[in-house]
Amino acid sequence: MELLSPKPLCSVVNCEDLEKLDHVSALNELRREQEIFKLLPGIYAHRYDFRRVSPSIINDFEYCPRLLWVQHKLGLKLLSEKSVVSIIRGRILHERYERLLSQYENVVAEYKVEIGDLVGVVDLVIKRGGEYIPVEIKTGFSKEAHKTQLQIYISMLKARFGYLVYRNHVEVVHRNDAALDVLKKIREILSAREAPPAKCNSCIFKPICKNLL
């Protein structure tokens, strides 16, 4: 059997049983997958390859270019205590959804795409009529960074469109090669000697940026 188009996340898998996931359990689960260490109260970190296209690196760019620059210099991805629960909850839902949809003959989970020094892993790919259609699963609210990331994958796969799968709805996103300009801006920031302007306000990571600079 072949899949024509994906359905919303919570119409396919159980989302309710993870609502009571606590911080300690989430942190222990995350530590099973990679080395996580505590930098400051409420702040954790792990090693990260900044060549990889991910919602986190694009989110960081949109949230604060300086934070992205600092993380690159440290070689670390910074996590707030609050975000750890969201990460693990999202990861478990990802796995459940991917496991069910990968049973279709024309669906491939965790599809790696690589062009030059640009590396990405698409959650799901639907093979249809010689075209590879990317599907990204998102457990948070709809964000522009999600759309940008998917458009980058669409361009890399030379597809016409892709799908953003959220908890209760699915969005169709069409190809826009201008999204690749975001990667150019990110590369410029990562290669810069001086930090870009900050947008600190009440950012929890402010002490780390301040200490590095």
From Swiss-Prot:
Cofactor: [2Fe-2S] cluster; Mn(2+); Co(2+)
Keyword presence, RNA-binding: no
E.C. number(s) listed in UniProt: 3.1.12.1
GO terms for biological process, alphabetical: defense response to virus
Consequence the record notes for mutating residue 141 to A: Increased endonuclease activity
Sorted UniProt keywords: 2Fe-2S, Antiviral defense, Exonuclease, Hydrolase, Iron, Iron-sulfur, Manganese, Metal-binding, Nuclease
GO MF term list: 2 iron, 2 sulfur cluster binding; metal ion binding; single-stranded DNA 5'-3' DNA exonuclease activity; single-stranded DNA endodeoxyribonuclease activity
UniProt signal peptide: none
Catalytic activity field: exonucleolytic cleavage in the 5'- to 3'-direction to yield nucleoside 3'-phosphates
Consequence the record notes for mutating residue 203 to A: Probably no 2Fe-2S center assembly, wild-type nuclease and DNA unwinding
Cofactor comment text: Binds 1 [2Fe-2S] cluster per subunit. Not required for nuclease activity, since mutation of the Cys residues leads to a colorless but active protein. Mn(2+) required for ssDNA cleavage activity. Can also utilize Co(2+) and to a lesser extent Mg(2+).
Outcome (variant: residue 153 to A): No exonuclease or endonuclease, reduced DNA unwinding activity
Gene3D superfamilies: 3.90.320.10
Temperature profile: Optimum temperature is 50-70 degrees Celsius.
Protein origin, superkingdom: Archaea
Alphabetized InterPro entries for the sequence: Cas4_exonuclease (IPR051827), CRISPR-assoc_prot_Cas4 (IPR013343), Dna2/Cas4_DUF83 (IPR022765), PDDEXK-like_dom_sf (IPR011604)
pH dependence comment: Optimum pH is 7-9.
The protein's enzyme class: hydrolase
Family named by the database record: Belongs to the CRISPR-associated exonuclease Cas4 family.
Protein function: CRISPR (clustered regularly interspaced short palindromic repeat) is an adaptive immune system that provides protection against mobile genetic elements (viruses, transposable elements and conjugative plasmids). CRISPR clusters contain sequences complementary to antecedent mobile elements and target invading nucleic acids. CRISPR clusters are transcribed and processed into CRISPR RNA (crRNA). A ssDNA exonuclease that has 5' to 3' activity, yielding 5'-OH and 3'-phosphate groups. Has Mn(2+)-dependent endonuclease activity on circular ssDNA. Can unwind dsDNA; unwinding does not require ATP.
Quaternary organization: Monomer.
UniProt name for this protein: CRISPR-associated exonuclease Cas4
Organism, as annotated: Pyrobaculum calidifontis (strain DSM 21063 / JCM 11548 / VA1)
